Amino acid sequence: MQPLVKGRYIARLATDPLDVARALSLRHLSFVTHRNLSHNLSDADAFDQHCQHILVEDTKSSTLVCCFRLMHFANRTPITTSYSAQFYNLSRLSAHLGAKAELGRFCIHPDWSDPDILRVAWGALTTIVDGAGVEFLFGCTSFDGVDPSKYQKAFAGVYPIKRRAAK
């Protein structure tokens, strides 16, 4: 993927271990520190070495403002080795024979809120997915807390919520 620029942001692939370390640092800030979890937790996992890491940087300060990773699965390659498969039964998704990719660890720096960050990130994702011929994109997401009512609108968009009849 060629770097993608919009306004003051650039999205590009990580090219070396230092880039991946920067992504891991932002992930730690977003998923551990910002949520007041144990600072000793690392956000690195065994999947990182098998993924493309995409960085979105502010061109004025070189600050890493967003990152995510993609793990590609070629045609007929089972997705049972994906991050998501650790937590969910993906057997029905495995029936899809085309190229697949798992989107993971998507985060935006907690101190940055410019919508162009998301636009550049999704633009880069689209470029990569289209360029690789990916037919099916999947992944996990994290929600703060355990109260699903806070996220009812988001859940309804991907999985219709049926109301139970009053007894």
Q: Language model features by range: what are they?
A:
Residues 73-167:
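Acyl-donor binding region in acyl/amide transferases
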Residues 67-73:
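Active-site ExK catalytic segment of metal-dependent nucleases
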Residues 51, 66-67, 107, 140:
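Generic recognition of cysteine residues
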